[in-house]
Amino acid sequence: MSIAIIIGTHGAAAEQLLKTAEMLLGEQSNVAYIDFVPGENAETLIEKYNERLTHLDTSKGVIFLVDTWGGSPFNAASRIVTDKEHYEVITGVNVPMLVETFMARDDDPSFDELVALALETGREGVRALRAKEPEAAKPQPKPAAPKAPQAPMSPEDHMKIGLARIDDRL
């Protein structure tokens, strides 16, 4: 079986995200979702997550894909993953992240590889049509200071000092 995925969002977005991904890829196995609706709290969400986990094969790990960092779905999932190996919470869930993560699971990647892929495709999936892509910041070479003449100074020559700092701490 593949790595388990649980989608958690505010409102009914989690169910719709899963339906959208399944519309593109077909039905997915070892996946569940929880919605956080008014009147619920973190304890309710933890109960929902734990109930969903009982129906999933978690032997290879679980990735919680949630909407926002610090939101209730994130906080509840964070409390579940704290003492478990191969459990992770990723925020910013979107359709490209889901689609790529589901497709990659078919290739049986390692847990860390799937987490990295979800993060990368989630970021790359957010774009603007007309905005120019930011160019990678290239370090600008510092202009070289003008070179002083290499010839020794004669007694008639004078040194020009532009700035001087006197430090009386010594």
PLM feature spans:
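Short, glycine-/small-residue-rich phosphate/pyrophosphate-handling segment
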Residues: 104-134
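N-terminal small/polar loop signature for handling phosphorylated ligands or for N-terminal nucleophile
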Residues: 47-59
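Short coil/turn segments at beta-strand junctions that form active-site/ligand-binding loops
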Residues: 1-3, 60-61, 85-86
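N-terminal intrinsically disordered, cationic/polar leader segments
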Residues: 2-3, 8-48
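Short Gly/Thr/Asp-enriched flexible loops that form oxyanion-binding sites at enzyme active sites
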Residues: 73-84, 103
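Short, acidic/small-residue loops that bind anionic groups at enzyme active sites
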Residues: 83-101, 114-115
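Intrinsically disordered, low-complexity charged/polar segments
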Residues: 136-170
